[in-house]
Amino acid sequence: MLTVAGVEFESRLFTGTGKFSSSQLMLEAINASKSQLVTVSMKRIDLKTGADDLLTPLRQAGVRLLPNTSGARNAKEAIFAAELAREMLGTQWIKLEIHPDPKYLMPDAVETLTAAQILCERGFIVMPYVHADPVLCRRLEDVGCAAVMPLASPIGTNQGLVTEPFIKMIIEQARVPVVIDAGIGAPSHAAHAMELGADAVLVNTAIASSASPIEMALCFRDAVNCGRRAFEAGLGRVQTQAVHTSPLTGFLQQ
């Protein structure tokens, strides 16, 4: 069981809501994934007009919403988006995203740390999307973040765990849940992240852009479960020298 800010989750697969061809398909994929925490961009929610209505199907699914500040270019904009989310959705949970560069969508470490400290002081449950920087993740823990979400590779690229060496360091020293976010492009990537000891993964593009999002959601669900079970069972130590599994000469001496 995964616990974030005192809330328990049976599923360690978190999902997003972007890039699906319809709200119905999104809902079916989320249901198939068994995800219990779903991110939603504040840019897409319009409670007045109901345009691109995400809230109704998500509430029908019974999932916990994790509004994000995607589109924010600095701490001030991110804090505004978080306050708006709290007012509109009635939740303290926020995925903090600040990426001023529209080409690569790299998170701004300085602005993220600044915003995280202020939001934590205001009572938010902050889950920041950041570079796989062990020092930064420790600082974010220190200011009160409920979890850290280091990127595996750039958003939407499906490159997998490019930052693996640094993710290992973050997992090793973390005192809060580590959720691998961005760049997870295949179920095998998700399984590997879980084998490393990550507490959860967040997947959006790989599911939503699949030719069969529902089937892909099922694949990710199973991959995350298997990866976690493998981690808990204990993986064998990686070595450079061959180690025989049976006596090499014993039967020749009989």
Swiss-Prot record:
Main location: cytoplasm
Annotated pathway: Cofactor biosynthesis; thiamine diphosphate biosynthesis
EC number(s) recorded for this UniProt protein: 2.8.1.10
Reactions mediated catalytically: [ThiS sulfur-carrier protein]-C-terminal-Gly-aminoethanethioate + 2-iminoacetate + 1-deoxy-D-xylulose 5-phosphate = [ThiS sulfur-carrier protein]-C-terminal Gly-Gly + 2-[(2R,5Z)-2-carboxy-4-methylthiazol-5(2H)-ylidene]ethyl phosphate + 2 H2O + H(+)
Key word Transferase present: yes
The UniProt record lists the keyword GTP-binding: no
SUPFAM superfamilies per the UniProt record, alphabetical: ThiG-like (SSF110399)
Localization per record: Cytoplasm
Binding annotation for 1-deoxy-D-xylulose 5-phosphate: 156, 182-183, 204-205
Role this protein plays: Catalyzes the rearrangement of 1-deoxy-D-xylulose 5-phosphate (DXP) to produce the thiazole phosphate moiety of thiamine. Sulfur is provided by the thiocarboxylate moiety of the carrier protein ThiS. In vitro, sulfur can be provided by H(2)S.
Family stated for the protein in its record: Belongs to the ThiG family.
Protein name: Thiazole synthase
Naturally occurring in which organism (per UniProt): Shewanella oneidensis (strain ATCC 700550 / JCM 31522 / CIP 106686 / LMG 19005 / NCIMB 14063 / MR-1)
Source species taxonomy: Bacteria, Pseudomonadati, Pseudomonadota, Gammaproteobacteria, Alteromonadales
The gene coding this protein: thiG
